[in-house]
Structures are given as C-alpha cells and as structure tokens.
Amino acid sequence: MLAVSAVLPDTLPDHPPLILIHSSANSAAVWRCWQQALAEQRWPSYDIDLRGHGQSGPRDLSHTSMQDYAADITVLVTQCRQPPVLIGWSMGGLVALMVAATGAAGACVGLAPSTPAQQFNTSVVLRTGEFGGEEYGITSHDPDEQPAMPDLDREERRAALASLGRESRLARDERQRGIIIEALPCPLLIVTGTRDRAWPRERYNHLGFTADYLSVEGASHWGLVLQRRALSSMIPEVLRWIVQHT
C-alpha cells in the first residue's frame, strides 16, 4: 500500500489537485510547510510516500527503479477526477516529469528537479542496493551540523532530518545513466534556489523542451521545500503560474 496524505478545502475547490512528490532518501514529511500554505490558499493537495519511504512502510529498495516510482504516482493520478498538477522536488521532480510525459498531468512543477537526459550515458554501471542521506552530505543527526541546509533554521533542520530514510541505489544509478524524456505535452515550471550549489539554474539550459523558470532568492536545495521565509513568497508565485497555465 502507498500512504497518501490529503489536505482538502472544506468546499468544492475551483483548482486542480496538486500531487506532491518527495525526493531521494527522504519522505512526504518534507511537504508539511507546503501543504499548510496550500490549504490556506484553498488548494487541494496530496503528498505521497513512494514505495519503501515514510508511511508507506519499509521494504527492500535494492531493485526499485525510477519506473517503479513513476508507477506509484500513476496509481494516484488515475484516481483523480481531473488532470492533476504534479509538483516534485529533486528526484521527485524527475518522477513528475516521467509521469507528465505520458500526458497524465495538467501541468508540472519541478523544484530543482533531477534533469532528464537526451541519451544514455553508457559508462554508468547500474548497481543494486540501498543508501541513505550520507550520500547527500548528511552525516549527522545534529541539526546544528548540517552544511547542506545553510538557509534552514533549527526547527526546519529538525523537520528535514525527520524525513530521512533509505533509498534505491539502482534508481540513483538510473538517473546518472539518464532518464530520457523527449517531449512534455503540458506546461512546465522549474524552480531553483540561488543558494543551491548542486542544482543551480544553469543545469537546465539544455533541457530539450520548453519551460518557464522561477528563481528563489536565498533558497538552498532543501530550502525549496522547508525554508518558510522563502516559501512565503515562492508558493504564491507557483500558484499564480498554475492558474495561468491550467
């Protein structure tokens, strides 16, 4: 079973549902600030724990692929009454793009998404196994020792650490080899943070298809999901874009 947390307005919404897709080695818990803000704006949202993550329960992820994660999102998408907007962060952004490429989404928003490829990097060897947050620079559970989260306050860092979990080595290697997406049949917004050293705006210069871009001043990679100061201006901008494009 897949765990999904829905936050719905108490009246019939005028907006399409938003599906929130977390990143590698963490869980849907990273979306707590987003869901609160979306509820205040009366947008229905669904955050999903991908298989083996968070509330979806532990399982062996050694052989889990990116296509498996896309299949998890498709299960939720097919239960929506209208085409949803997919919002994915980092690895989740690439999963969102994979599902959107099938024509299932009304629009797609990538928060510093892992980039799709135009061809395979055949030098990458696909391995099985699991890893954790240490591969992303998180080697301590002390909120005061998190160089990967320079813009988060202590409470936000605690939330980030609480979201951590295991991840599929195979899925990561597949991303390194390349997930090919040739075209996207829906509007795309890519959001980047000016303090994100891993996924700056420049990494999307050769995306291969049309996208709009939003730069968030002072936000790191983690800041795009948990830095409340940045989210207070960023989320309204994202919602305005969605209204204009759906």
Where are the model-predicted features located?
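Serine-hydrolase catalytic-loop signature spanning alpha/beta hydrolases and amidase-signature enzymes
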Residues: 25-33, 45
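Conserved alpha/beta-hydrolase
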Residues: 38-58
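Catalytic histidine-centered segment of alpha/beta-hydrolase-like enzymes
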Residues: 219-233
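Conserved alpha/beta-hydrolase "acid-adjacent" motif
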Residues: 192, 197-203
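Flexible "cap/lid" loop of the alpha/beta hydrolase fold
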Residues: 101-136, 171-177
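Active-site glycine-rich loops that stabilize anionic/oxyanionic intermediates
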Residues: 23-26, 194-195
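Active-site loop/oxyanion-hole signature of alpha/beta-hydrolase fold enzymes
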Residues: 53-84
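Short beta-strand/loop motif that positions the catalytic acidic residue
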Residues: 184, 190-192
